[in-house]
């Protein structure tokens, strides 16, 4: 049974690629056609590749894997934080700090600083410090929390990265490659898929598309950890959508209506 139906992907706008002038030719195998200057992603392939990604992530979770969700663009920030947290995993949803993976020991010193300031705030230390010093410490805490809060409790370098828009997150991709950490990613029509281990061809700019696929990766982790099916209702939804739109139907719907396109 497919993890997501073509209808669900269509409703989330997963099929909208970038403008044809902004494409990476290596994504050609995942493109169905072009309409009104926009590439239409082949959702039949996306359905299967989401299944592959889901199974990969679930298996890694069953083996006790640590996952890092990465998405710093505005459209991804909320979904990345919420879904990683729901799955009991870790995230970076603001600027990726160079060396987050390749200089993990240094990053840990900054995380320790964050924890120390938090402790000072709760153990009464702030009450005996000058107001100016407390103000500076709070500013430092806010900055550290913004960039490191999502990995504050990450026990080690992650076993898998899930990335929304690897083109934007190229430093994270490069660091993962150096450390041989597999990458699962939402890959749009303007991105080089060769950098990614487990590809999900998808619109990576629409909030609903990002939320839908990110939530499925979180579901895979939860299912892998629990050793049971995540959502029977989801399977029923996919079954009900089985006779949903073909790619031809989707292209017809797109004709003259690119409101969701970039």
UniProtKB/Swiss-Prot annotation:
A single GO BP: translation
Lineage: Bacteria, Bacillati, Bacillota, Bacilli, Lactobacillales
Disulphide bridges, residue numbers: none
GO MF: structural constituent of ribosome
PROSITE patterns: RIBOSOMAL_S2_1 (PS00962), RIBOSOMAL_S2_2 (PS00963)
Region (Disordered): 224-246
Record's protein name: Small ribosomal subunit protein uS2
One cellular-component annotation, GO: cytosolic small ribosomal subunit
SUPFAM superfamilies: Ribosomal protein S2
